[in-house]
Amino acid sequence: MPNILPIEKQATAVLMLCEGNSIRSVERMTGIHRDTIMRLGIRVGNACADFMDSRLRELNCRRIEVDELWGFIAKKQAQCLPEDYATGLGDVYTFVALDADTKLVPSFLAGRRDEVTTNLFLDDLQGRLSNRIQLSSDGWRSYANAVHAAFGSEVDYGQIVKVYASPDKTEERKYSPPRITKIERSPIVGEPDHISTSYVEKQNHTVRMHCRRLSRLTNAFSKKLDNFKSAVALHFAYYNFVRFHKTIRCTPAMAASVESSPLEVADLIEMAR
């Protein structure tokens, strides 16, 4: 007979991954072998990606904020060899769109921080919406062209750029960001009346706290890009459909009228069967 892990233990392992634990720490706490946990996370993560792709459609969002957060695969970009680029090693950015009202993440994409990935991300976002939106982003140079290509003139889009002070050479900041001296808001398309990325920047913090592969100074980073994408998909499925948000007092999927009740971790596992 095949040695199949009971659904309760699978749910425990997946929940631990979704709450910021590394694979090896889950192994120590549950006694499940790390290779089994890895395969489970990939399988459930891929199923979650397919589920969200089909479920998050015709969304009635009003204010969307987009941003990208940095991570890396196997090694940081400065350590990469020319041949590493084709295999997906080095820096990876996760582009995230957040509905400022419901806190739903309707679209996300992991890849290089370049024009191609930005275009794919905005195209995907546009295809999930049913109405005109207010869209805000930072000043990343590829956003303006990507928004124009995806939305045309059917969007109210603005950029917010934060200007930072030059750090004093004697200042011991360690990992703290430099001081913000000015914030510039610029309308790009249409008539955006509220340009802000505050909520999506807070969402970046949530991702780093709940997805161990993206934690600051982590030693639990991904070794393969495909595994990283599966972990990110698992996180956002848990965030959108399972975890209660304290501000809105329900899951983001419920707030956006995508679901009428929260899902359980066991439901995510069932999708992968």
Stretches with model-predicted labels:
Residues 1-273:
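Residue-level recognition of single "structural anchor" positions
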